[in-house]
Amino acid sequence: MKTETKSELFRELPSVDELLHAPDFAELLALHGPTALTDAIRSVLSRLREQISSGLLNRESLQLALGGLKSAIDAQLRRALSYSLQPVINATGVILHTNLGRAPLAEDALAHVREASRTYSNLEFDIAAGERGKRDVHVDRLFRKLLSPVSNAHVETAASAVPRALSVAEGQAEPDHAVSTIIVNNNAAAVLLGLNTLAEGGEVIVSRGELVEIGGSFRIPDVMAKSGATLHEVGTTNRTRIADYEKAITDQTRLLLRVHRSNFEITGFTEQPSIAELVALAQRRRLPLMEDLGSGALVDLQQFEIRGESSVLDSLRAGVNVVTYSGDKLLGGPQAGLLSGRPDLMARMRSNALFRALRVDKMTYAALEATLLSYVKREYAAIPTLRMMSLTKEEISRRAETIKNRAQSPRMKMNLTDGGSLLGGGAAPSSVLPTRLLAITCDEMSADELSAKLRHFDPPIVGRVEEGRVLLDLRTVLPEQDSLIADALQRIA
């Protein structure tokens, strides 16, 4: 297309002011106001200019587009005035998908958030005393129940979809100290608060192999610098011994830090001290030991064949003084950073001015309280994250077969194939849960095109594209969403 021809096409586009005052747009103007309508008009006209510039529109196609201008502007208005944050169907098989919001909340948690948010609440009010209270009492009481030593705990099996409670090993002595927990807005904030409270102005000893970077360019050394503590690296990337920690301790040392390698593993010629060795060293040198678990489970994940994820209780029982972890990962609750440990250390953190800057609101407390109550009452199946982890390959296969039978068509080929689900969220990167995938191909479109069509449904369906196929893993799909997937596939076919 010649430049002068493009210029002619540009001249055929109406002005913003012309459309704003056109009789056809009077209803939209009255309904949405001049600001919203002007923005929508500019957005639609801008797209038309881009299409002309790139040669995608000729005179005939431009006239068709101008004929549908009112509809296009109306649609743009509806998009602009609707929610950007919206539900999606997660068919990726990644349970704690960070980009898709991590852990879905339990129904009780959603109900409690609404109940606590629609009116006033006793967030920081002691009803019995009639005076100001503390907001973290609502969840600290539950964490004390869950993280206190428990003997002869009842054990459930994974097959029953109810994770077993963590229990003290037979004959193991129970520690007699209490555990206190405080809440901030995410695990990075928890690490920041812990370092600032316990080590500001001093040194923190950490293994070089644990200086991790996770999503969003979050690096442990950067957080440490912000905390006011000085990083003292010991060992090498693949091998660090307890002697390396001991040699590094000076009068400036304030804290020993263990960081869980959340999203990668080091294998082969490796060595690192055990938690027991670090605890013994910390006690001998009268230093606090803090462990950043990252994800942080409240149940034993080995029943799901998930290895390499220590529980919060495991760390506390081993003698770690402060454990930091996330609320919206393996715990299955809202986004939050949790610090559990020695009450005297927690008291110091509560008195830190940084704590107020990092504290969470009533909605987070409500969602977390309801989630923790499910743990206390052993209603583990009510927590979607734990329920998804407990699903068997056979259960997933039956659901996938039902969708396949309902949506099968000559234009679309579907079959079931073996695959693996991931925990995600940086948890247990090498653990893969056996699953059955619904593999889909379509004669008239590529896998990428089919995937795009699925994402444009309401709610959007997000799967994986591998080897020219769209793969849907129902492990991360809520059962009530199965019919929505079947309907979408039928409409595409």
Q: Positions of the model-derived regions?
A:
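Short Gly/Ser/Thr- and Asp/Glu-enriched loop/turn motifs at secondary-structure junctions
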Residues: L13-P14, I89-G93, L331-P334, L433, ...
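Conserved PLP-dependent catalytic core of the aminotransferase class-I/II
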Residues: V206, T364-Y365, E369-G424
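Intrinsic disorder/low-complexity segments
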Residues: M1, S148-V179
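Long amphipathic N-terminal alpha/beta scaffold segment
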Residues: G55-L105, H112
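Conserved C-terminal alpha-helix-loop-beta "cap" of PLP-dependent enzymes
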Residues: S397-E480, L484-I485
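Glycine-rich phosphate-binding segment of PLP-dependent enzymes
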Residues: A91-T92, P104-A128
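Long amphipathic alpha-helical segments
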Residues: M1-R78
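Conserved PLP-enzyme active-site core in the AAT-like
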Residues: G130-V150, H177-S374, A488
